[in-house]
From Swiss-Prot:
UniProt keyword annotations, A-Z: Disulfide bond, Secreted, Signal, Toxin
Stated name of the protein: U-scoloptoxin(10)-Cw2a
Subcellular location: Secreted
Membrane-spanning intervals of the chain: none
Sample GO molecular function, one term: toxin activity
Similarity annotation: Belongs to the scoloptoxin-10 family.
Length: 79
């Protein structure tokens, strides 16, 4: 059995993870570090980030979770 497909799949996954992590704001990544691998906390952080993009008044931490959208929307804020 060839190992090439397995190696290719690993490279694709690593590239995808690196691409996504590079696009996230530093303050959001710091919030994830504070969760320290707690899957429930991480899911809340991601959900709150998505919700903050459309409603900055949802949480007092919205400017940290989605700084490209709160308090003012920039062109980088997803529509």
């Amino acid at each position: 059995m060839s190992k090439a497909p397995v190696v290719f799949a690993i490279v694709v996954v690593l590239f995808f993870v690196e691409l996504n992590a590079g696009g996230l704001p530093k303050s959001f990544l710091e919030a994830l570090k504070m969760a320290k691998g707690d899957k429930v906390a991480e899911s809340f952080i991601y959900k709150n980030r998505n919700d903050c993009m459309t409603n900055c008044k949802l949480l007092p931490t919205c400017p940290r979770l989605a700084p490209e959208c709160c308090p003012t929307k920039t062109p980088e804020c997803p529509k």
